[in-house]
Amino acid sequence: MKSSRRVLLKLACGAMAAAGLGLHRAAALAQKPTFRDADRTRDKIVALVRSFGSDDPRAMRHIQKIEPITEISIPGVTVAPDQLPLMDYFVGDLHLRYSFDNPEFVSSVSAGDLKRLGLKREQLLPLSVENFRRLYPGRKIEYPLPEIALVTDAGDLEPCLMLDAAFWEKESQRRGSAIIAAAPARDVLMFSDRSARGNVDLLKKLTVDVYATVGKEALSKTVFLWNRGRWEAFA
């Protein structure tokens, strides 16, 4: 998350706690994509967390079940099947879009890329988690409110941490409590423990406020529960 955005989020969290104010976020800059295979290597593949943008029950997964989305089309554009972006269902209204990490634009991974790189489809998820850990070893956990942890310094890909099961198992054990988390925007991931009911209510309010203010960068209003090694839609 960009430093100015992080400071703004922290200030807004404090203001909300004191006066019920919402959160604000700087607008993203438009970028003109330039794709080169030399930049599209296996060590840059990550899984972007994205939203279906609706509550269509056909797309919803109340319990995490990561599996390929097979019916993909790009409106108004004719694309060869092996050039379509590779995407997976995730949990709730969230899905995964595999991409080559680039701070300027989304460069989607396709079946053609898998062939070029000698990868199998089932390798994408574990490779993405491994790459995210390696690419952003300096990510931080900050506390804009005592009850709320905020993931920062992860290249605007903070919600990708939701895919790192080892992190959440360790965090749950450290806290001695089940973990609740929310990704209301493409670069915002907040979490807390479920031990106090007030934590759920506070995280939900923050999530709704962020979601309402970030426009096209919004992800989900749902609070998710880490339970038995997977996420569940919780509140």
Region annotations inferred by a language model:
Residues 171-178:
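Short amphipathic beta-strand starts and helix->beta connectors
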Residues 1-15:
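N-terminal secretory signal peptides and thylakoid transit peptides that target proteins
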